[in-house]
Structure formats: C-alpha cells, structure tokens
UniProtKB/Swiss-Prot annotation:
A lipid is attached at G602 (GPI-anchor amidated glycine). Keywords: Cell membrane, Glycoprotein, GPI-anchor, Heparan sulfate, Lipoprotein, Membrane, Proteoglycan, Signal. It comes from Drosophila melanogaster (Fruit fly). Changing S549A: Lack of heparan sulfate glycosaminoglycan modification. Does not affect binding to nord. Disulfide bonds: none annotated. This is Division abnormally delayed protein. The keyword Transit peptide does not apply. Cell surface proteoglycan that bears heparan sulfate. Functions as a coreceptor for growth factors and morphogens, such as the products of dpp, to regulate signaling and distribution of these ligands. Required for cell division patterning during postembryonic development of the nervous system. Plays a role in dpp/BMP signaling possibly by stabilizing dpp and thereby creating a morphological gradient during wing development. Might have a role in testis development. Changing S573A: Lack of heparan sulfate glycosaminoglycan modification. Does not affect binding to nord. Pfam families: Glypican. Glycans are attached at N97, N101, N150, N187, S549, S569, S573, S601. The gene is dally. Interacts with nord; the interaction promotes dally degradation. Interacts with Magu. As part of the dally/ Magu complex, associates with fwe (isoforms ubi, LoseA and LoseB) and is unable to interact with fwe independently of Magu.
C-alpha cells in the first residue's frame, strides 16, 4: 500500500506539473500573438504616414519643377530648342523634368555644334595669321625691290651719268626678274604637290643666271664709258667688240668677286623667302584640312558629356541666366574638352610644334639676318656701284687684258645721239619702306604661342567661362557639388585615363595621318633649305616620325597601375572614389537568420529554467516508473 500510495502521489504531482506547464505555455503563446498584432498595427500606421509625406513632397516638387521649367523654357526657345516646359517623361541622360529624350537629342547636337564652332574659330584665327603674314611679307619685299630699282636708277644718274642710256633697260630687266621670283603665287607648290609656273627649287638657279647675265651686259658699258676714256671715245662699241667682251667676261674678271657675291646672296635670300612663304601657306592648308575633320572625330561619349556639361543643368531646372546656378567645375570642363579633342591633338601636336620651331629658325637665321632678303635688296645698288668702282680701280690692268683678247675698241656712231653728260632731273631722295622688323617680331611672337596649338586649343574655353577654379559647389556633370576626379594632362598617353572621355585608341585616323605626313614634309623642306641646322633638324624629324603616321598606338607599360587612381568610371558624378559597402566579417545570411530565431527561443531566461525543471521531473518520473 505504501508503495502504491507513493506511486499515486507521484502521478498526481506529475499531473499538476503538466497542467502548470500547459498553462504557462498557453499564456506565453497568447502574449506572443498580442505582441505580433500590435507590431503589425504599428508598421501599417508608419507606412501610411510615410506614404502621405512622400505624396505631399512629390506634389510640392511637381509644382516647383513646373515653375523652374517655365523659366528654362524661355532660354531653350532663345537657342531654337522647342520645349513644352515640364515633361512627365524625364530624359535618360540628364534626368530632369524640363527635358525629355527628344529635347536631350536636340541639345546634344547643339552642344556638339558649339564644340566644333570653338575649334573652327581658333583654327581660322591661326590660319588667318599664317596667310596674312605670307601676303604681307611678299608685299613688303616687292615694295623693297621696287624702291631698290628706283634708287639704282638714281645712283646711276648721279654718279655714272654716261652709262644711263645703255644701262637703264638692263637694270629694269634685272629687277623685273627679281620681283617675278618673289611672287609666291607663281612659285607656290601646294601640299598636294601641284605646281605653279615653276617650283621653288628652280628659283635660286634661275635668278643666279639672271644676275650673271646682268653683269655680263654691264661689262661693255662700264668699260666703254668709265674705264677706257679718251677724247676719241665717241660713239658706241661695235657689236662684234661687245660680243667679244661679253664672251670673255669670266676670263677678264672685270668686277672682281662682286658678281658672285650678288649671285649667291640674292639667289639664296630669294629662295629662303619662297621657302618661308611656301611653308606658311602649306601650314595654313593643313589647318584648313584639319578643321574639316573636327566633326568626324567627335565620339558618342564626347557628345554625351558635352550635353551634360552645357545643358543638363537647364534640364534640371537651373536657369542659365544665373551664373551661380550653372557654374561649371573647372576640372570637369577641362577633362571633357581635352578628352573630346584628344584624337587629333595627340597626332598633330608634335608635328605642328616641329613646323613652328622650323619657321622660327628660318626667320631668325635667314630672313632677318645680314644675308636675308631684306638686307640684300637694300644693298643691291651698293653692290652695283662697287662693281663699277672695282673695274675703274683695275682699269690699266683690265685694258691690257681687253686689248690682248679683243684688240682696240671699234666704235660706231651713237644710235640714239650723244649721251648728255649732265645728270637728268630726278625726284627727291627715295626712302626705304617701313622696316618690317616690328611686324616680323609680332609674327614670331604669335607663331611661337601657337607651338602647342593642338594641345591647348580647347583650354581657352574653360579659361574664359565662369567656372569654379577650386571645383567646389559647381556642376560636375550629374549634380551640383564637388568635383573630385583628377584633372588629366593633355597628350595621348595621359588621356587614356581621362575619367570623362577616355582616349579611343581604335579610332579611324587615316586622314589625320595624312596631315601628319604633310607637316613632316613642310618641316623637311625648311630643313633642306637651311643646311646649317640640317643635322639637328634631321635628328628631330626622325624622332617625330617615330611618333607620327604609320606608328603603333603605343604600349602601356608597367606604370599603368600608377595611373589607376585617375582611371575613373567616366560617369562624371564628382562623388569621388567609390567605396563598396562590404558585409561584416563572418556575417552571412544564414547567420543572420539563426540570430533572429535565437531571439525567439531564448528571449526569456525564466522560460528556459522552467523547461529545464520540467524535463528533470519527467526524467525522475520515468525512472521511478521503470
């Protein structure tokens, strides 16, 4: 009985425990349900309140956008862009309510047109400088030649009066020949190899022959009127005697070395003048041909960023009349403009710089030197006078040579009457034209500034516009803020890492390579005409040709990683380097889920203790029962 009573008591205790545990579990489940229901009601209320706030803000934004877009609409109409104000469809590029996709397409074309116009303007200006200087230089040396002829006639009429009737025509013929060789329109060889009446290579030899012919003709006149003087020296020399003197001109050497000096100096200086004018015109042609290619070199990426730079602020409701609202980031502007011009600038920059260096050397060492065309023309009448004086000084020796070779002079009556010993009336002293040195100095200054023309052709735009130099609080392509991308230097190698418009190494550059070859030929023609600098010029040209047409696009070496910081995504957002959000170490989805379930099962420590006590009692009960 005692054992039975014990078992009965144990059974009752077990029943009571089970009931207690059941009640506790039921109570716990009811509390969880209440908490879950209350959480659901709170979430629904919060979601409803947020939706009302969002709808209210959207309503306010629509009203504000409508007002802003109305202001932008008038600006668009002023630049011939049709706009209906606010669009329900936002443009894919700018993302503003004031432009749809069609508007953005129009604005993109207009931005590209503005860029081309900028290039046309600067190219046309430089081309005009080259063409104008070629014409002004030609005009000046022709004027000098005409004045020199007048001064020579005046000299003969004052000093060598008896020679005037016979020498007037030969002097005029010589100067006519000189001026014909200085007219570049007849000597010009364009960059396509098409010749005028003569190529400049024949100018020097033809002119030297004309100078020699002048002195050969002058010899009988100078000998008869200034050397072989006598009372019976009346009349003209017989034609046969004149022919004898002219035929033996080289052996008699009447004027010393002066004819050879004039031949050399005049021939070389006129040749250099033609080379100079020819180079100016060919360089202007290259600029003109490059000007026609600008539009073909604009990539879609370039056009996209030109749109973002010029008009996306307007599409987002910022009126262009307010400079503070549309102020561009200086670094962003430079990167876009340099990236858009990198293809032709990278190819043409070095060859163009070489041409400018050669032109500078040609002007300073040949055109403006003591043996340059200006000084040579100014001293022609002095050369002629010195030649006659040399013949007179060596008169006795010269007469011996003449009598030995041609005999005693044979005379004929004057064909046009006896020459008047009195000097003919002449105009007031002839003055030289304005010295061209100031104009040439200005030209040299201008052409020297154009040495990096293709590198800096677009920088002027960013320098002239209203920009934020420190790249703070400005338009960075997608928003107003700070522009944190690196400003990439000009040059093909650097522009590969342009964060906005990266250099396109696969672009078609066939026509540009043709222009590179033309620039090399211009520099080579200048170098060939200036042999004193031929070694250095040849070395420089060979170096340039290694970078010019036909060359590869180059290899990126181990320093590619060094430029990694500059190699941005190209989105132009100006947000700076992107730091990806990484998950905490050791944190996975599964672990997040297990932690959530742990919160439910172990949120109350008393429940864990009761469960442990219950399991202990049940174990004891089953042990007793067994």
């Amino acid at each position: 009985m005692a054992a039975r009573s014990v078992r009965l008591a144990q059974l009752l205790l077990f029943t009571l425990l089970c009931g207690f545990v059941g009640l506790s579990a039921a109570k716990h489940l009811d509390l969880d349900g209440i908490h879950h229901h209350q959480h659901h009601l709170h979430s629904a209320t919060t979601h409803h309140r947020r939706r009302l706030q969002r709808d209210s803000r959207a309503k306010d934004a629509v009203g504000g956008s409508t007002h802003q877009c109305d202001a932008v609409k008038s600006y668009f109409e002023s630049i011939d862009i049709k706009s209906s104000g606010t669009y329900s469809e936002k443009g894919a590029i700018c993302g503003g309510n004031c432009c749809n996709n069609a508007t953005e397409l129009e604005l993109r074309d207009k931005a590209a047109g503005m860029f081309e116009q900028l290039l046309h303007h600067h190219t046309s200006s430089l081309r005009g400088v080259l063409e104008t200087n070629a014409k002004q230089f030609q005009s000046h040396v022709l004027e000098l030649a005409q004045i020199s002829e007048n001064m020579t006639h005046s000299l003969f009429s004052k000093v060598y009066t008896r020679m005037v009737p016979s020498s007037r025509m030969m002097i005029h013929q010589l100067y006519t020949e000189i001026m014909n060789h200085l007219i570049y329109t007849s000597n010009y060889t364009n960059s396509n190899g098409q010749l005028g009446r003569r190529g400049i290579g024949s100018v020097q030899s033809n002119l030297e022959e004309a100078v020699r012919h002048f002195f050969v003709q002058l010899f009988p006149v100078a000998y008869h009127q200034m050397v072989h003087l006598s009372k019976n020296n009346l009349g003209d020399l017989h034609e046969d005697y004149v022919n004898c003197l002219q035929h033996n001109f080289d052996e008699m050497h009447p004027f010393g070395d002066i004819p050879q000096q004039v031949q050399s100096n005049l021939g070389k200086s006129v040749h250099m003048s033609n080379v100079f004018m020819n180079a100016l015109l060919q360089a202007a042609e290259v600029l003109s041909e490059a000007d026609a290619l600008y539009g073909e070199q604009l990539t879609d990426t370039c056009k996209l960023h030109l749109l973002k730079m010029h008009y996306c602020p307007n599409c987002n409701g910022h009126h262009s009349s307010s400079r503070s609202e549309t102020k561009l980031c200086y670094g962003y502007c430079k990167n876009v403009m340099r990236g858009c011009s990198a293809e032709y600038a990278g190819l043409l920059d070095s060859p163009w710089s070489g041409v400018v260096d050669s032109l500078n050397n040609l002007v300073t060492t040949h055109i403006l030197s003591d043996t340059g065309i200006i000084n040579v023309i100014k001293h022609l009448q002095t050369y002629f006078s010195e030649a006659i004086m040399a013949a007179m000084h060596n008169g006795p020796e010269l007469e011996k040579k003449v009598k030995k070779t041609c005999g005693t002079p044979s005379l004929t009556p004057y064909s046009s009457g006896e020459p008047d010993a009195r000097p003919p009336p002449h105009k007031n002293n002839v003055k030289w034209a304005t010295d061209p040195d100031p104009g040439m100095v200005l030209f040299l200054s201008t052409i020297d500034k154009s040495k990096e023309f293709y590198t800096t052709i677009v920088d002027n735009f960013c320098d002239e516009q209203q920009h934020s130099r420190d790249d703070h609080s400005c338009w960075s392509g997608d928003r107003f803020g700070d522009y944190t991308q690196l400003l990439i230097n000009p040059g093909t190698d650097s522009q590969r890492y342009n964060p906005e418009v990266p250099f396109n190494a696969k672009a078609q550059t066939g026509k540009l390579n043709e222009l590179v070859d033309k620039l090399f030929k211009i520099r080579k023609s200048i170098g060939a005409a200036a042999p004193s600098n031929s070694i250095q010029a040849t070395h420089d040209i060979q170096n340039d040709m290694g970078e010019g047409s036909g060359g590869g696009e180059g290899q990126i070496g181990d320093d590619e990683e060094e430029y990694g910081g500059a190699h941005g995504s190209g989105d132009g957002s100006g947000d700076g380097p992107h730091t990806p959000i990484e998950e905490s170490e050791g944190t996975t989805t599964n672990e997040v889920e297990s932690r959530d379930s742990g919160k439910t099962s172990g949120s109350n420590p008393l429940e864990g203790t009761a469960t442990w006590m219950l399991l202990t009692l049940v174990t004891m009960l089953f042990s007793s029962c067994s």
